């Protein structure tokens, strides 16, 4: 205990010394029990998470500008160790991994940065952000009071902090970084490490503070974060679940306000997109309620929407079963909460009338009304004036010309003597592949004697990988796959025909991402565990200890046949008479669609594999794994325009399960339908106080409003997804809206009776619902 107190005291001394030095420079950031204090002024911050490695440098300026226009003050990002140090001691800060360039772009647009260094990040990211070489460090135990781990963690954190200092990116230096994070959600696994857990927390905090960045440090979901490190909340409803700061001198910060929720029974669970599942986005009203409650109940002063821009898990960086498309949450406008009264109604069904300081108010179900100066309602969470838009994928190029496609059938390894490794045991997969490929071949020879009787046998394989494909004597015999929420092991039990004499069994074990969380992650095992053959009534013959050969990766991967140079290293065939079957590479070319709309591939006709454009992997696909809705978890795959050339773009896919490439289309994405729904008692934005509520709609990408699909001033039924005229309707609704909007990029229509020629139904609360098309 005394040792822990000494460390805490040392932290405070170091932090105080740093604050004194930075204060002399005229720029200082500290905190008190209410908020972060920037150059002497308390600030309330609204932040959005945006990961530089999940987009491209060409996209960053526009994404950041949209975040700023959406009302954000701060962009929050993780730092991904495994992209920056993929090989020990060899660093990469180029292209989409140029962290400094990303932060400078944020600064150029006048926003602040929350830098989550981790270096464990989870983030549904490969190996939780750790480089796999860390797994092979002798005697290492991740995220514990373990000297090998602490040394490597300190080296990387110091590398990042030193880089930020050298570039002058911390706020006291004139930069945008106002806060940093060390570790991430460690409390969830801390008990697994016993006494080592708290010691590690104290060490991590001391190490971070000792780097003297001049800005506060925080730990997410870490109630025992030592002073001066701030403990923060991650979750859906931090206004209800957060225990609060562990010191009266620390502010309440919400570092992850999740913008999607679980489809299951646990309403407070985070739901990120995984293969085989549907994802449920949160309604803006629900997010607004949660934010207002956090501010009212916990005195919150920092909220970050996770995610504000989701982006793409390029290449193989998605964690286990996580889709290539990382989700986008709906951003909310910023509201200047200089309010002193929050009236909360937790009832989800009733609208009570309340008296507050001689003011009579109705509180909508599950809502919070924010009163400025305890008198004027400036914000109601049940009435979020957010525009809704519907994205449309427009097929602009069909890749259905059979003459433009070529195929290469991936060879199934048959010869043990040509294996990468051999051994009389079943190897663990990630240790063998170093997580540099999803694929590991297990090859064994089985001698079948005539005396064994029936040539039809059963092949039994149990595996801790995610997918298994089995071949016997070069013939495909079956596959099996798991799921994110299912049992860890998968089992293949299938018939096979054996010939007399030697038979070659080739098993392709496939990982769909590596783990990203959990205690003792370095000890997790994957790959095939048991292989057996049963013939007739004979006992199962286990092959676990036979001589096995191993081939790491696919042949096409080794030769990089997805690149312009590598594509010439194999003999491609026409697909005129090709019967689609597992493990086939396909290639073609396509032209870049004109314009600036986002470009995607529609891979609905395919099965499972990976796709490259001009040598750049745009990620794994798995459209054959349907969600409960019956639809693929993801069918459209984003191609950043920065990956493209004007024409002759090389498209290469490796298909594991079959699929028809002739049905693939190149699409552009655009918001073709926009909608606004505001009632006459909605609170206008603070900057418009005193004015009447308005429906505001606008088209993106230079498009203009071409038609009005629906307009009703009265009591329209439904919302932006489903709507019809109600019992009260102004006949002039459509003509008024058309006159205000047609041919324009955007328009605003006051929600007031005079605009529509008078009150169509006195005594009834009215709203205006408008649905418009953009072209």
Curated annotation (Swiss-Prot):
Single Gene Ontology MF annotation = carbohydrate binding
Gene Ontology CC: apoplast; plant-type cell wall; vacuole
Q: Does the keyword Lipid biosynthesis apply?
A: no
Q: What is this protein called?
A: Beta-galactosidase 7
Q: Which CDD domains match?
A: Gal_Rha_Lectin_BGal
- Where the record annotates domain SUEL-type lectin, the positions are 689-775
* Record family assignment: Belongs to the glycosyl hydrolase 35 family.
Please give the catalytic activity noted in the UniProt record. Answer: Hydrolysis of terminal non-reducing beta-D-galactose residues in beta-D-galactosides
Give the source lineage, highest ranks first: Eukaryota, Viridiplantae, Streptophyta, Embryophyta, Tracheophyta
Q: Which residues are glycosylated?
A: 257, 266, 277, 358, 602
Instruction: Report any Pfam family annotated for this entry.
Output: SUEL_Lectin
Give the PANTHER family listed for this entry: BETA-GALACTOSIDASE RELATED (PTHR23421)
| Gene Ontology BP, a term | galactose catabolic process
């Amino acid at each position: 205990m005394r040792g822990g107190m000494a460390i805490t005291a040392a932290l405070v001394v170091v932090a105080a010394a740093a604050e004194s030095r930075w204060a002399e420079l005229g720029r200082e950031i500290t905190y008190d029990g209410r908020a972060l204090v920037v150059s002497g002024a308390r600030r309330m911050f609204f932040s959005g998470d945006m990961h530089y490695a999940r987009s491209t440098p060409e996209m960053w300026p526009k994404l950041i500008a949209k975040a700023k226009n959406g009302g954000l003050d701060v962009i929050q990002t993780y730092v991904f160790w495994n992209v920056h140090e993929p090989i020990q001691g060899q660093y990469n800060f180029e292209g989409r991994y140029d962290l400094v360039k990303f932060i400078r772009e944020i600064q150029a647009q006048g926003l602040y940065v929350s830098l989550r260094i981790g270096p464990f990040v989870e983030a549904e990211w490969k190996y939780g952000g750790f480089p796999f070489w860390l797994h092979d460090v002798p005697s290492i135990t991740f995220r514990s009071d373990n000297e090998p781990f602490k040394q490597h963690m300190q080296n990387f954190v110091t590398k990042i902090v030193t880089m930020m200092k050298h570039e002058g990116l911390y706020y006291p230096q004139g930069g945008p970084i106002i806060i940093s994070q060390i570790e991430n959600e460690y409390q969830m696994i801390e008990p697994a490490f016993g006494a080592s857990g708290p010691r590690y927390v104290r060490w991590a905090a001391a190490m971070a503070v000792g780097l003297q960045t001049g800005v506060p440090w925080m730990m997410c979901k870490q109630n025992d974060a030592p002073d001066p490190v701030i403990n923060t909340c991650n979750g859906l409803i931090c206004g209800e679940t957060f225990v609060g700061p562990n010191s009266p001198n620390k502010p309440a910060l919400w570092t992850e306000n999740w913008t999607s929720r679980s489809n299951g029974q646990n309403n407070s669970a985070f739901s990120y997109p995984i293969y085989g599942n549907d994802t449920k986005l949160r309604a803006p009203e629900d997010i607004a309620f949660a934010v207002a409650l956090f501010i009212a109940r916990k005195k919150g002063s920092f909220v970050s929407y996770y995610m504000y821009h989701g982006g793409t898990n390029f290449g193989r960086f998605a964690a286990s079963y996580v889709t290539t498309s990382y989700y986008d949450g709906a951003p909310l406008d910023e509201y200047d909460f200089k309010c002193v009264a929050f009236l909360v109604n937790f009832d989800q069904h009733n609208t009570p009338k309340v008296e507050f300081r001689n003011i009579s108010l109705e509180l909508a179900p599950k809502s919070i009304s924010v009163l400025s100066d305890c008198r004027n309602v400036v914000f109601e969470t049940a009435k979020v004036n957010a525009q809704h838009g519907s994205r449309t994928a427009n097929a602009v190029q069909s890749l259905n010309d059979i003459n433009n496609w070529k195929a290469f059938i991936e060879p199934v390894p048959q010869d043990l003597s040509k294996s990468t490794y051999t051994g009389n045991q079943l190897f663990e997969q990630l240790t063998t592949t170093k997580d540099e490929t999803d694929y590991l071949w297990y090859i064994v020879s089985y001698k079948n004697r005539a005396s064994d009787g029936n040539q039809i046998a059963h092949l039994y394989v149990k595996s801790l990988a995610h997918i298994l494909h089995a071949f016997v004597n070069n013939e495909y015999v079956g596959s099996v796959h798991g799921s994110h929420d299912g049992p860890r092991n998968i089992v293949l039990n299938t018939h096979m025909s054996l010939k007399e004499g030697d038979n070659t069994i080739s098993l392709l074990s496939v990982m769909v991402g590596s783990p990203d969380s959990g205690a003792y992650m370095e000890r997790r095992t994957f790959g095939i565990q048991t292989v057996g053959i049963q013939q007739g009534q004979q006992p199962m013959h286990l092959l676990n200890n036979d001589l096995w050969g191993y081939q790491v990766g696919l042949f096409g991967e080794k030769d990089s046949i997805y690149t312009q140079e590598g594509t010439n290293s194999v003999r491609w065939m026409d697909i005129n008479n090709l019967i689609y079957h597992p493990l086939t590479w396909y290639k073609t070319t396509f032209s870049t669609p004109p314009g600036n709309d986002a470009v995607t591939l529609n891979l609905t006709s395919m099965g499972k594999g990976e796709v490259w454009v001009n040598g750049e992997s745009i990620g794994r696909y798995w459209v054959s794994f349907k969600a409960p809705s019956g639809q693929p978890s993801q069918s459209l795959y984003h191609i950043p325009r920065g990956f493209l050339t004007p024409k002759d773009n090389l498209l290469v896919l490796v298909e594991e399960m079959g699929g028809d490439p002739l049905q693939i289309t190149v699409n552009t994405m655009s918001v073709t339908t926009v909608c606004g729904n505001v009632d006459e008692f909605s609170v206008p934005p603070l900057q418009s106080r005193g004015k009447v509520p308005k429906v505001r709609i606008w088209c993106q990408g230079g498009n203009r409003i071409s038609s009005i699909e629906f307009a009703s001033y009265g009591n329209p039924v439904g919302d932006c997804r489903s709507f019809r005229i109600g019992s009260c309707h102004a006949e002039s609704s459509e003509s008024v809206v058309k006159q205000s909007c047609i041919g324009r990029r955007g328009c605003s229509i006051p929600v007031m009776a005079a605009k529509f020629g008078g009150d169509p139904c006195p005594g009834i609360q009215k709203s205006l619902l408008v649905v418009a098309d953009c072209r």
